[in-house]
Amino acid sequence: MKKVISLIIAVLFIATAFVSCSKESAEQTSSTESSKSLSGTVATDGSTSMQAVIGALGEAFEAQNDGITVTYNPTGSGSGITAVGEGSCDIGLSSRSLKDEEKASGLTETVLAYDGIAIIVNPENPVSNLTLDQIASIYKGEIKNWKDVGGSDAEIVLIGREAGSGTRDGFESITNTKDLCAYRQELTSTGDVITTVAGNPNAIGYASLASVKKTVKAVSVDGVSPSESTVKDGSYVVQRPFVLVTKKDTPLSDVAQKFFDYATSGEANEIITSAGVVPAN
């Protein structure tokens, strides 16, 4: 009798284990199939300064998620904010914080990272450091010649960004030069500013630190050189946020939400850092 009871218990144990394993296997299969079936496009639009970091995040995300594509339209911060508000993209990209009226219209911001705004000159320019006050005076047209700040006897050529640019907004806010700058040229992208300054020995401009190339020279501001570490510790004062903009009361699509969650997670920090900016997370 004891043998019969033992046999029954053993059979019941095996049956229970089989059912449990079958259930777990089915759940795993269902989860895998669900992940594989998720496909579509995540449309981002906005800041040209965010090209490097969004490009890096998009590439890494696509490598982990077959069937999902992340697109980027470099239209500038203002246009990206408008695009997400109008529903023509999933996520807007802004290199400035949202204004009160933009928040009031139903938009919300999530800070992705922090980026320095580099003050750039031609590599031939001997000037390597400027104070914040000198930068403001230069852009307001009060200092017109490089010799007045330790450079050559040559007229300063002021290069800036177009109205609506997040980089311009950040630069003018920090230097207190909003609507006061005497620009020679107002260009529509970070790349254009860098190219123009690289081609003119007397030019000065501002650009995302993450985008600065060896064709230009980033000067120190108040004795502090722009770098990831000085942006992170706050000693380099010319900096601004990189922001993801979404609609407050409108849920993202499943694929857009998955990308958003990835970009703002600790998992993405290494990718963000490799793009030359400081993760906010």
List each model region and its residues.
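Alpha-helical transmembrane segments
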Residues: 11-15
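C-terminal motif of bacterial Sec signal peptides marking the signal peptidase cleavage site
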Residues: 16-20
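Exported/periplasmic ABC-transporter solute-binding proteins
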Residues: 4, 21-281
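Positively charged n-region of N-terminal signal peptides that target proteins for export
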Residues: 1-9
